Amino acid sequence: MGRILLIDDDQAFTDFLAGYIRDSYPLLQVEICNNPIVALQRIKASAYDLMLIDLEMPTMDGLKLLGFATQTGMDKNRIVILSGREADFLHNLCPMGTCLAVLNKFEARQKAVLDMIFSSLQKKAGGP
């Protein structure tokens, strides 16, 4: 089973995205963390196949979480940064190679990229 850690302070968004993943990709297990400080402990305590991190959160931004995760051994190519900002801003902030992807979480076109990532993880977990 592929394990995903979804870190975002917007509970409505995390509930929606986790529900979508559970319905569409049954071999993927989603853990939600709405508090970035609590996420630090989860990152240290468990191994994840994918992390989805919101860029803008109170107390700690997503880039600090990205740095912490990679320092504790998480492969940067298993981390996706999500934001409500425009793509150009995001790509300037996180140049290619910083992480697997930097996506606007509200743009429908960006959903296709997430679906490709989820589909790949589902296949690695033994699914169709």
Segments from the language model and where they lie:
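Hydrophobic/aromatic residues positioned on beta-strands within the core alpha/beta folds
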Residues: 81-83
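Active-site beta3 strand of CheY-like receiver
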Residues: 46-52
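Helix N-cap/capping motif at the beta->alpha junctions
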Residues: 18, 32-41, 62
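Two-component/phosphorelay signaling modules centered on CheY-like receiver
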Residues: 11-31
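Active-site residues of response regulator receiver
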Residues: 8, 54
